Amino acid sequence: SSSEQQRWVLEAYRNASGKNLGDADFLTQLKGEDRARNPVDDADAFKAALRYPAINRYWFWRLDYILWELYQNSPASDLFSGLESGEKAAISAYRFKANRSIEHVHPQTSTEPWAEEDLHAFGNLAMISASFNSAQSNDGVGTKFGRVKDQRASRGALESIKMLLMFKAADRREANWSE
C-alpha cells in the first residue's frame, strides 16, 4: 500500500541522516532499497500485477519519476524527441502529486470496444487526480488527448508524464490510439 511505501522511505531517511550522505548517494541508496522491495524479476507475475483493477498506484508514481529523471538528465533522449516546446516545458515543470485515480485512456464503455486484456493493461492506464478523472467521464480518446494538450500550457498542471507520452505515441491523434 502507499502508506507502506511512505514508511520505508521515511525510515531510510532517518537511517541516512546520521551518515552524512550526499544527495546523489542517498538517492542511489533509495533506488537500491526500492528495487529490493519491488522486484520485477518474474515477467508474467509483473505483467499480471500491472492490470486494472489490482494494480498498485505505486507503479504509476515510479514510472513518472523514472520518466521525469530521464528527461532531467537526458532531454535529447529519443523518448522525448518530437515533443513540442510546451510539452517539454510541462515535463520540466512537472510536480509529483498524490494522484489516486486510475484512468483508462480508451474508455471502459465505448462504441468501439477493446479486448479486456488490452483495455485493462498498464499501457492503456494513467494515474491522474480525481477531479481530472471526473472530467474525463467516458469521453473518447480524442477528447482526453485534447485535455492533455491543454495541460501543456499551464505551468505545473501536467497530470501524468506517462499520459503525455501516450498522447505523443499516438501522434496526438485519437485514430492512432489502438490495441
Predicted regions and their residues:
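Flexible coil/loop and intrinsically disordered segments
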Residues: 1-179
